[in-house]
Swiss-Prot record:
Protein name (record): Uncharacterized NOC2 family protein C1B3.09c
Domain of life according to the entry: Eukaryota
Predominant location category: nucleus
Single GO BP term: ribosomal large subunit biogenesis
Annotated keywords: Nucleus
Coiled coil: none
GO cellular component, one term: Noc2p-Noc3p complex
Pfam family, one: Noc2
Organism name: Schizosaccharomyces pombe (strain 972 / ATCC 24843) (Fission yeast)
Length: 528
């Protein structure tokens, strides 16, 4: 291969250095926890005797939704504190004016019209003549700024009434349109409109036709005051966690789940600083649960904090966020991605047994998606290598009844009983998913100048196992394409006259070599 050979070896060594160090640290951590006295009892020991069949539906919403204020509070760059509405000596807030009883829709319209009249907008007398006497006197005696603050509160209260009527009247969508128009006229909030945002969230989840209007309203709230973004996000993130209690196949309204996730991602995209703060905070929460699981390793049920649908789908959501926002906020995503990726790999390594291969495949699928969306190299070969002996191992056939019983859908499964490991159907399902993910993963980097070094371990192990078993058509096809791509890239780099330290030349090489033109790339293109 000439000059590129030594440089390629050096490139591979440096590229995997951080990964090797991370694995050593994880191994040392597990060794420390493993040497503890197994007979001791922890004060916070998880409740024993929990039915293993129900662990995937354990409700951990509070753990995963709570975010420390210090981690997520948005800096205001010197803007005033919006938690309390302060009015000067000549003014008053709406909360200081006759709040003993809730105003009717008619009273609110009259008050809004009178505020606009005092501000110079022409209003018919019939619109404002019924304004409350106390409120009228207050509005007459305050300055323009104080009156504007009262007007915003009146509009907020009016919008909440319209949204309440949305669910109980036939003209619900007409009320929603009026509420949206009112919200868009609000220029500032005296405090976080929790009632309003909660109503918007409930309508978004339960009424698909209203989602576009709800999205406009929420975007407006976050844009006029970015410090409210965290609280708004938390309100909408809560129902998402409710969806995450069960597997995706058990969700009654999958479209709502998808649209809610996309809406939250769009909400994060409104502000780069908000995206950075909220992502760090929630990923830190997930990481804290993993550390708690390791600390409580003496308990046989400690792993249930991590190995459940809520944790898995929450982690996958944040991996999806990184993939989706990479192009818009690349620098921030590069800071966040190592946390999410290392957390995912550590979760996989927590219980790396064959029973939990479905969970591993769920997480690997998200990591492969990041590789595809960002072209970020994540060393996943070892994760695939561990599963290859199992998927190619020969097993004695079980009875037809047991085979049907153990024919799990990988999409709706995180783990399987130990008896299922003998099932041919389970092994076939795992093999299919492993080959599919490996094909996509290696196709992504099939134009990399280091592809031969990347694929060599997989080729060596697969070739040895294939000779000892009946691998099947898909495995042989994958192996042949992998070897062909190995030779293809090696031949293309044979005569290069630069080293891998010359990043501009490396990038030019990989840019000229379209991954779709490689044997592995063509295999993916043909199957999609």
């Amino acid at each position: 291969m000439g000059k590129a050979s030594k440089a390629t070896k050096k490139f591979t060594k440096n590229h995997l250095k951080n990964t090797i160090e991370r694995r050593k640290q994880l191994a040392r951590s597990k060794k420390v926890y493993g040497t503890k006295n197994r007979n001791s009892h922890t004060k916070n020991k998880l409740e024993s005797g929990t039915n293993d069949n129900n662990k995937n539906k354990e409700d951990l919403s509070k753990l995963y939704s709570d975010v420390t204020t210090s981690n997520t509070s948005h800096e205001k760059d010197g803007s005033e504190d919006i938690s309390v509405l302060n009015v000067n000596s000549k003014g008053a807030s709406l909360n200081q004016v006759s709040t003993q009883k809730r105003r009717s829709e008619k009273d609110l319209l009259a008050a809004i019209a009178y505020c606009q009249k005092l501000s110079g907008t022409n209003q018919a007398d019939a619109l404002w003549k019924n304004v409350e006497k106390d409120l009228k006197e207050t509005l007459d005696n305050v300055d323009f700024d104080a009156r504007s603050k009262i007007l915003q509160d009146l509009r907020l209260e009016y919008a909440e009434i319209l949204l309440t009527k949305f669910n109980f009247e036939k003209k619900g969508y007409q009320n929603l349109s009026s509420a949206l128009d009112t919200i868009l006229h609000i220029k500032k909030f005296s405090k976080f409109p929790n009632g309003l945002v909660t109503q918007l969230c409930n309508i978004f989840v339960n009424h698909s036709k209203a989602r576009e209007d709800i999205q406009k309203a929420v975007n407006h709230i976050c844009k006029i005051d970015s410090s409210l973004s965290v609280a708004v996000f938390q309100v909408f993130y809560s129902p998402l966690l409710d969806f995450f209690k069960s597997s995706p196949s058990e969700v009654n309204d999958f479209d709502t789940l998808e649209e809610l996730q996309l809406f939250l991602i769009e909400l994060l995209s409104l502000n780069s600083r908000f995206y950075q703060k909220i992502a760090f905070a929630y990923l830190s929460q997930l990481d804290a649960h993993l550390k708690r699981c390791l600390k409580e390793s003496e308990s046989s049920d400690a792993y249930k904090l991590i190995y459940n649908w809520q944790f898995t789908l929450s982690l996958r959501f944040w991996l999806h966020v990184i993939s989706f926002l990479w192009n818009d906020y690349e620098s921030i995503s590069k800071e966040i991605s190592p946390i999410a990726i290392n957390l995912t790999l550590d979760c996989i390594r927590l219980i790396p047994t064959e029973q939990y291969y479905p969970l591993r495949l769920h997480l690997l699928k998200s990591l492969v998606n990041i590789c595809r969306s960002t072209r970020l190299y994540i060393p996943l070969s070892s994760q695939f290598l561990e599963m290859i002996p199992f998927v190619l191992r020969r097993s004695s056939p079980l009875s037809d009844d047991k085979e049907v019983m153990y024919n799990f859908d990988m999409y709706s499964t995180l783990h399987v009983p130990k008896e299922c490991l003998l099932s041919k159907s389970y092994r076939n399902n795992v093999r299919k998913e492993v080959i599919l993910l490996m094909t996509e993963y290696f196709a992504i980097f099939s134009n990399s100048i280091a592809f031969p070094e990347l694929s060599a371990p997989i080729i060596a192990q697969l070739r040895g196992l294939v000779n000892e078993s009946a691998p099947g058509k898909h495995v042989l096809t994958f192996l042949n394409k992998l070897e062909s791509t190995f030779s293809f890239v090696e031949s293309r780099r044979m005569n290069v006259d630069f080293t891998l330290n010359d990043t501009s030349q490396v990038e030019a090489f990989e840019k000229d070599l379209d991954w779709r033109s490689t044997p592995m790339g063509k295999l993916v293109s043909d199957t999609t």
